[in-house]
């Protein structure tokens, strides 16, 4: 462990995990003989970290989160309750993920992923200004709104927004905003879910669009 780590009750930590690893700027300060303490890592109650997990300083994991083997979470991230980080996922810095989500693949800096969303593909910056250096460019990140899916091998590029209850098919490429309740295939081919004729998504679309039960008030 590097720095301070705060554990909730009944947390499980596997073998060879690294918690509270300093961000790059703090390591550079140490090379110059200047030492400082980063923000603590906070692990919520009943969270589970499997083997060889790396979590950088200042990251907060909500209650009952699960982080699988060899996943990496950068500094200053916020991971909501009951979210699963799948094995080998690479989550960069300052990423915000909601509750009950499932995340794999590569997630670039400052990405926002909404509640109950599933991201199996890659969310990346455009990286159009390499001349400014690695830390010189400040690009807008992708935003994945609640209840959306990014399939395996799909790639969302740049500061685009994926609307709620949208489905990015496996292998698709997205470089522009996607409205709510759309399916994206190929390269930016968008189809409203009420016009989607495929059978494989029919159950999910029905789940998204069925009327929500309401509780009668006394």
Where are these regions (language model features)?
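Short, isolated positions within intrinsically disordered regulatory regions of eukaryotic proteins
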Residues: 9-11, 200, 212
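Flexible, glycine/small-residue-enriched loop-and-beta-strand segment within the central core
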Residues: 2-6, 10-159, 187-188, 195
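Intrinsically disordered, low-complexity terminal regions
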Residues: 208-218
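A glycine/serine/threonine-rich, flexible loop-to-helix segment
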Residues: 194-207
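Short, glycine/charged-enriched secondary-structure capping and boundary segments
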Residues: 116, 183, 198-200
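Glycine-rich, phosphate-binding/catalytic loops in enzymes
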Residues: 84-85, 184, 201-203
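C-terminal/domain-terminus segments
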Residues: 67-69, 161-185, 190
């Amino acid at each position: 462990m590097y720095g301070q780590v705060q554990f909730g009750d009944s947390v499980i930590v596997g073998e060879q995990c690294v918690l509270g690893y300093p961000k790059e700027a703090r390591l550079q300060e140490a090379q110059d003989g200047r030492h400082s303490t980063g923000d603590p890592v906070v692990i919520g109650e009943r969270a589970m970290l499997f083997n060889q997990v790396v979590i950088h300083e200042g990251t907060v994991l909500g209650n009952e989160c699960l982080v699988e083997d060899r996943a990496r979470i950068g500094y200053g991230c916020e991971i909501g309750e009951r979210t699963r980080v799948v094995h080998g996922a690479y989550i960069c810095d300052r990423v915000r993920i909601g509750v009950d989500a499932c995340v794999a693949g590569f997630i670039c800096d400052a990405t926002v992923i909404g509640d109950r969303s599933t991201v199996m593909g890659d969310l990346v910056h455009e990286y159009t200004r390499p001349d400014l250096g690695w830390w010189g460019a400040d690009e807008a990140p992708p935003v994945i709104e609640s209840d959306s899916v990014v399939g395996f091998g799909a790639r969302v590029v740049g500061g685009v927004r994926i609307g709620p209850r949208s489905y990015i098919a496996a292998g698709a490429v997205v470089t522009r905003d996607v409205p709510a309740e759309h399916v994206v295939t190929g390269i930016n081919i968008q189809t409203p879910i009420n016009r989607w004729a495929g059978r494989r998504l029919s159950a999910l679309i029905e789940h998204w669009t069925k009327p929500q039960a309401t509780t009668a008030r006394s």
